[in-house]
Structure formats: structure tokens, C-alpha cells
Amino acid sequence: MSNSKLPIKYGLPERLVVGLLNKLTKGHLKVTYTDGSSRHFGNPDEPVSAAVIINNDDEFFRRCAYYGNVGMGEAYTDGIWDTPDIRAVISWFILNMQALQGTDTSSDKLPGVGLLKIFNWFRHLRRANTVDNSRQNISEHYDLGNEFYSLWLDATMTYSCAKFQDPNLEFEKAQTAKYEALCHKLKLKSTDHVLEIGCGWGGFGTYASKTYGCKVTGVTISEEQAKFARERVKREGIEDKFEILIQDYRHIKGQFDKIVSIEMIEAVGDRFHQSFFAKCHEVLAPNGIFALQMITVPDNRYKSLTKGVDWIQKVIFPGSLLLSVGRVNEVLLKTSDLFLHDLEDFGAFYVHTLENWHERFNAAKDSLLKLEFDERFMRTWNYYL
């Protein structure tokens, strides 16, 4: 049955969602109802590129209409809808992102959708990254257990974008290539004392101290990460080179020749950007270098992101916020005499990084289930990865 002949059965929520999807013209999404009937969105002349199979029609449209992208994500993890290929569904929405978002609005401002998003927004506001909240926010994600992450991260235990100069490069080598690139940008010497803000499981600090002979002080607020990193340092025999501290960045003291921070600043939040960069300026030695790897958004979308909350912010990284390059420059001007000297964009490598994580995560499914992570958890992380 075609879209035009299929009646609206579930009232205003269905009408709003169908009305929005009808505006999307790229690709071909097939949505199948519980009775077997279906609607087609995008370009019907193209082969079906993504499929949504609804298991509870009424609840699906209610979640999507009331809570926007957050509702759709939570509906997936709750089994309200399914798909043979979650990446294809998300790719279809990305393909139509311009129609969904325009040039300066967030995905939570879809016309007529997300009617109750204010409840998620208030919840997000309560998770602002104060010293106490930061520990809670980080713990919820990174303290799922070192065994959990070791089952699907590569051997370096790196949880950030790798650098694939060659798309066929082995994952571990691509992560090591990223570390080497950062060391090169930092112009590391054996006499340097390096501060790593957000040291994770110790991958970069281990590489830098062993390869360049420099001293590294790594700070984290994750108890699990600190435990793993300290054991790693001892195992590698670099106790005299690499020190791990459980410490909030706001409490860092001393002076360092170089600073590095790898995809940690996303956990700082708009309210605390100035304090973050002011602290970096305070502890960086004269003529020092600060290498910052971060996930960015276009400048024209940053402001809108500060006023909304998406599924990842609610479910995966509470309190998080992506920055734009313009936002970084704005804060640097207000807080320090630091300036942007070199900018490299390797965001395209995140495609390969996520592909590796997704495949490795699902390959470890049986082991993860034995750790008492249930099917809902698996669906949540599949949606994320």
C-alpha cells in the first residue's frame, strides 16, 4: 500500500512523524508496521537503502513525536522498533541531515517533533560538569569495567579516533600512528615533562614515555581507568616516567613543558570551557605546546547544541558537549595568550574507527553477555557505535 493510501491510525504523533519524514527526499527508507503494511520515504525510485520494522506502532510514534531523536533512540534500545542494519538507518538520516536541521539548528528542533524534549533538557542541565558531577558523569561511562572495554578496544586500549593513513592499516597500528602524530606535533624531547588531561587507560602516556623517554603525568577522574593505567605502568617498567593521578583538571598544580588532551574536552561543557583553557594556560611553561584532539561541529551549529540534548548526551555521555573550532578560538582569546598554531582535520578516519569498534563489540557479544550486560545494553551500544 502506498503512503497516500495508508491511513493515519495513531493520531497526532503518527501524523507529525510521517509529516516530517515525507519532507526527506534522499535515499529510500521503508517503515513496516506491525500489520505488515509499510510506508516509503525518500526517493521511491531508488532501491530500499534502510528499513525500520516497528514492533509497537502506537509507542513508536509517541516516543518519536514527544522526544525526537532521543525518543527514537530509546525506542530502539527498548525493542519498540528493529532493523536488519542499524547503521543503514542512521546513515539515511545523516543523508537527509540538511532537510532535518537546516544550517544552524539542532536535531532537537525538528518541526513539530520533540514536543516534550524540555524534560530531557532539564535533566541534562542537572548534569553540568561541576567537580562532583564530572566524577559521576565519567563514572557512568568509563567505570563500566576495564574487562568490558578490553573485550573490544584494541590492544593499546585507546578510545578515540585512530589515524588511518592507509584504510587497510591494522587498527592497533592506526591508533599508534595517531599517538606518534601527536608526539610529532608536540615536538617531544626526552627532557620534556608532559601533562595529559584525561589519560584514559594510559595508552598515550605509555607510548610517549617509552618512545621518547619523556616524563608524563596523566590525570583522570575514573577510578577504573586509573587502576588499569597504574598496573600498565608497573608492567611496562616505567614507574619513573609515567605517573597517574586521580584528579580533576581544575585541581592540577605545577608547570609542564607540553600538554596533551585526547577527546576529553567533550566532557567539559560550555559553562566550564573558560576554566579548562585558563588552567591549561596556567600550568603550561613559557613557549610550551598544547596538543588537543577533539570531535568538532560546524561553527554555525555550536550555539544550538548548547540549547538542546541529544540521545548520546542523555544515554551515553551525560553532561557532554562537542565544540567548534570557533568556540575554541573564542575561549582562548578570553582566557589566555594561547593561540591556534596548527589545525589538522582527520574526522574522516572516525568512519574506520567506528567500523572497527562496532565489529569488535559484536564479535565479543557472548563474552559481554557473560559479564551480565543484557540485550538492552547491547542494543544501546550498537545504536551508539
Language-model-detected regions and their locations in the chain:
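Feature captures hydrophobic
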Residues: M1-Q175, A181
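Conserved SAM-binding loop of SAM-dependent methyltransferases across substrates and taxa
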Residues: W201-G213
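Substrate-binding/catalytic lobe of Class I Rossmann-like enzymes that use SAM or dcSAM, i.e.
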Residues: T296-L385
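A short acidic, Gly/Pro-enriched loop at the edge of an enzyme's catalytic core
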Residues: R250-I259
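A short glycine-rich, Lys/Arg-flanked "PGG" loop and its adjoining helix->strand segment in the class I
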Residues: Q274-P286
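Conserved beta-strand signature within the Rossmann-like core of class I S-adenosyl-L-methionine
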Residues: N287-I295
